[in-house]
Amino acid sequence: MFPALTQYVNIKEFMRRIVVKVGSNVLTREDGHLNVTRMSALVDQLAWLRKHDYEVILVSSGAVMAGRGELQVDHQLDSVEQRQLFSSVGQGKLIRLYYDLFREYNIKVGQVLTMKENFLAKEQYQNQKACMNIMLENGVIPIVNENDTVCLTELMFTDNDELSGLIAQMMNADALVLLSNVDGVYNGDPNEPHTRIIPSVYYDRDVSEYVSDDKSSHGRGGMISKLKTAQEVANAGIKVIIANGNTPNILIDLKEHPMETLHTEFVARPKEK
C-alpha cells in the first residue's frame, strides 16, 4: 500500500512558533552569488507571519556562497580551508543583508552561530535554548547557522536540515518548514510525466524508496537528508513541511491556501498529554 495520504491534511490553523530553514539552492543565483531578490521575498513573508502573531526562527544557509562571491583566491584550498575562509567572510555579509531587509519592517534580528557540541552537552544546550527564548520574548528573530569557521569536519552537522530539526525540537516549535528548490517529496522520478507530489506522510511511514540522493549544487544536503530530518522531527511531535522556496509567497500560501499549495506535510506524532 502506498505509504502516504492521498490528500492534504487541513493545516489552515497554522502554528504559533515556526522554524523556517532555507537552503543554499534557494538563496543562491546560478552564478554562485547570493540572490538578494529572493532573500527580500523571503523576508517579506517572514515579516507577514510576524505581523500575524507567529514567532519565527530562521535557519539560513548561504554564508559560504556569500564569501566565495567576495573573494578571489589565487591558490588551491582544500575543502576545510574553503569552508572556513568563505564562511568567515560570508556570514557577516549574510547577516548584514538580513538585518537591512528586516529593518524595513522594523523587525530586529540576532545571529546565532552554533555547533553540534552545543546540542550534546546539557549546560551548553540549556544556555543556547535560553538565549533564543529571550530573543523571541523580546521580538528578535534568531537567524541560525552552523559556525563553519571553527567546526571540525567530523563534528559538523550533516547539513542545515539536521540543524533545523534539532532547533525545532529544542525550541518546542509547532512546525518546521524546509524550503528547497523542489515542491516536496515525489512518488517517483520527478522527470517522469506521471510522477506526483506526495501530499501527506504519517510520522511512522517510510517513503525513502521514492527518493534519490541528489545533493544541492550549492550545499551539503539532499532530499534523503530532508526526509530523515522530517521523519525524526515529526516523530517527536512537530509538524514538518517540505516546500519550494522559489515559489512566490510560498509561506503565506501554506498558511492561507494549504490545500491548493504544492508541498509534502509530515503529520506529527500526537504529543502525550
Task: Report each predicted region and the residues it spans.
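C-terminal catalytic "cap/lid" subdomain
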Residues: F2-Q76, V80-K273
